[in-house]
Structures are given as structure tokens and as C-alpha cells.
Amino acid sequence: MGIHAEQPKESIEEQIQRLCATVPDYPEPGITFRDLTPVFADGAALRAVVDALVEPFAGQFDAVAGVEARGFLLAAAAAYATGTGVITVRKAGKLPRAVYTEHYSLEYGTAALELHRDDLPAGSRVLILDDVLATGGTLAATSKLFAKAGVNVAGYGVVLELAELHGREALAGHQIRSLVRL
């Protein structure tokens, strides 16, 4: 044993909290934005995040879906790591072929997400990944898109969950893996 003892390995939660940037008053005054891009920019942290998100769902999905935009980063890495396909859930008007559309409420107004109708065959299983779970509206809309396609949702994985916004309630009945709950 040398003079320098090996440091204990940092947990995934500790890595995320260390790397996540907190931006006050963004995108508007009174809002505290949690920027996960420094987590994704760190290769070891990104690998640890992806591994931690998919591990509870091992063998339970045929493809990984990412919600625009940061969900794409997670889904592509997870699909590659697990040898499955990646599916993109996009904002309305961004996909070129026939789509399913799901409208959902935002704090101020509404939005819509779309999924290509032929991305996955009916009966397939999909793991849905996104960066943050807040109110659950975006992920619930994503789940409805896959239901329209006859695709089963294996579960949800998110890096950061804002627990005070009760997003889990909108996703009742599905397994949710969140790496950090604030």
C-alpha cells in the first residue's frame, strides 16, 4: 500500500450532482435551470449514466426511444450499449413520413410530439429515456404515442427528477428509473 490511498469510487448520483450546472433565472426570472450537458460531456459520467439507466430494464426492451432533444443523446448511447435500435420522438412537424401525433399541455399553452407510424412493429417493447422528469407531461404524451402504435412501454429512465412537480403521478403503472431526485 502506497502513501496515497485509493479514493472511494464516486456514486452516479454524486457524479451527476458534481457535474450538473445550476443556472439561476433561466429561461426566465425565478426559474433555476439544471443543465445536464456537462454530465453528457464527461465520457466516464455519460457511460455511467447510460449503464445506470438501462440496467433495471435489461432484457425487457427491443428499442430505446429518446425525447427531443437531450433524450436523443441518452437513447442513442443506450441503444448502442444494448445492441438495440433507437427511436426519435420529435416535436411536431419534424418527421418526414406518416406519424402519430399527441398533443399535451404545458405550463403556458400546448405542444405536440410525433412518432413515425412504422418505426416499430406492434407488440415491440420500448424503453423511453429523457434528461429530466418534471410534470410528466412530455413522457406521458410519449407513452400515448407508443400506445397508438401498439408498442409496449417497458419503462422510463431519466437522469434528473424534480420530485416537487409530481411527474411520477402522470406515469403511474410504469417503472421509472431516476438517477437523482431533487
Curated annotation (Swiss-Prot):
Annotated EC: 2.4.2.7
Gene Ontology molecular functions: adenine binding; adenine phosphoribosyltransferase activity; AMP binding
InterPro entries, per the entry: Ade_phspho_trans (IPR005764), PRibTrfase_dom (IPR000836), PRTase-like (IPR029057), UPRTase/APRTase (IPR050054)
GO cellular component entries: cytoplasm
Keywords: Cytoplasm, Glycosyltransferase, Purine salvage, Transferase
Pfam families: Pribosyltran
GO biological process: adenine salvage; AMP salvage; purine ribonucleoside salvage
Biochemical pathway: Purine metabolism; AMP biosynthesis via salvage pathway; AMP from adenine: step 1/1
Compartments where located: Cytoplasm
Catalytic activity: AMP + diphosphate = 5-phospho-alpha-D-ribose 1-diphosphate + adenine
PROSITE patterns (UniProt xref): PUR_PYR_PR_TRANSFER (PS00103)
Signal peptide: none
Root EC class: transferase
Similarity annotation: Belongs to the purine/pyrimidine phosphoribosyltransferase family.
Task performed by this protein: Catalyzes a salvage reaction resulting in the formation of AMP, that is energically less costly than de novo synthesis.
Subunit structure: Homodimer.
Protein name per the record: Adenine phosphoribosyltransferase
Gene symbol of the encoding locus: apt
